[in-house]
Amino acid sequence: MKIFSCIKPVVDPTTRFSINESKTWIKTQDATFTASEADNYALEEALRLREKHTGEVVAVSLGGEEAAKVLRAGLAMGADRAIHLSDARARPASEFSVAETLARAIERDGGTDLVLTGVQSDDLGTGATGVMLAEFLGWAHATVAIGLSLDPESKTAVVERELEGGLLEKVEVQLPAVITVQYGANQPRYASLKGIMAAKKKPFMVWTAQEVGI
């Protein structure tokens, strides 16, 4: 079972920051970055599925050094390898372009059985990237997952979704698929000292936008 876990770097909410001169975003030069919270839940879910079904977890992120930082943290948590999409064109503002870049990277890596993302990012909060990613890949998708089980033989996933008003829904999707994971779906593990040391020896690939065909 091969699982991609998408991780977005966001400004640490405890960081003091200011608006840039053009008043379009914050000044990121001195900001501290961390993984978007929901993406940590997605990574934890990926690690649990790997532990149950064997296989590998591939962490992927777009951006500069801030992306490399969250990928190293993901490796320390337990991901098997990381793909850093590092290029000016691999840091677009639109979710559409982000989803396209992620899709091309997954294809370049030979595809996968499952892609997990957080339900939304802590900064923009649109919740659109995962759905767009599924569309680019031509795969089924399920959103706002709070529970997930896989059947490798039938290549299906049963997803428990949290709907508005506290309602729950169970759906079955055919693999490969993209699933977005809700806040609080599990308890993300802390990176151990052993995990931090092991992360330094794990494969860490750096690809440009041109290399993934963007």
Predicted regions and their residues:
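N-terminal glycine-rich FAD/FM-binding segment characteristic of electron-transfer flavoproteins
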Residues: M1-I214
